[in-house]
């Protein structure tokens, strides 16, 4: 039995420090958490009595605490985990590398409410943790576990090619990573933002083109967009964006929202446009994302906070106010 400190949400929306006790099963690994990213999804669960956080990074603990059936990790290995914790491993989706769509998938917010990455330790199935490349410090690896995996999966899994033009709406926690990944994939990257305030930063991250949208009736771009990643917490003005989509282009809503997707009908029909759902990356794609980030030196831009009640609340407040540049990272003691 292992006992460790965790940080939970509450009905009042306050962060509560608590304790979790868990046994380590034969196929599980005990991880000393060193860093956790703060994702916008965490905001949606802060009023629930559950341990928060799903962008974890840490170190595998001493060998006698590693599950008896685990042979892939050893003491001191740098590892991370993300949104998914388990699947059935025998359905069609699991057997074809799409375990994120498994009917029995275990996902953050819906399963394992007694632990998360806002904690000093975590115990996860070895099959659902990921080895972090030595060249990526864990403070940068943590936000990649969900934010990086989300944008990489959209770019990687739906036939994006280096010759394609990728549009990215919003330069926040997801958008600033999407710019880097799309640029390093060889795509022409057009960034859309309401104002000019983040233009210089977007260009430094790898954007080829920057377009402001506020007060503009018709967007002017150098070429039609093949893939449009929506990385804002609100739906864009589709009357602005649908006219700049290439025939057969794809729209990717990537942020969590409880609102209905409302979009003009005829432009979708006439342009043979697609609206493509994209969850987080399956394990093979997740590992590929980490290797790609290591090879191309992709790093999130982060702000650090202590992993305490006060630190977590300050981090979440800054994100809520829209002032985070661009991913908050909690540092465990």
What are these regions (language model features)?
Residues 175-176:
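N-terminal Rossmann-fold NAD(P) dinucleotide-binding loop
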Residues 87-169:
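NAD(P)H dinucleotide-binding glycine-rich loop of Rossmann-like/cofactor-binding domains
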Residues 192-196, 255, 279:
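N-terminal Rossmann-fold cofactor-binding loop
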Residues 255-271, 283-290:
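Rossmann-fold NAD(P)-binding glycine/threonine-rich loop
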Residues 21-36, 45-92, 133-136:
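Glycine-rich beta-strand-centered segment in the early N-terminal region that forms part
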Residues 245-247:
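Helix-to-beta-strand junctions that scaffold the AdoMet/dcAdoMet cofactor pocket
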Residues 1-4, 184, 283-333:
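C-terminal hydrophobic helical "lid"/dimerization subdomain
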Residues 162-171, 181-240:
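Adenosine-nucleotide cofactor-binding segment
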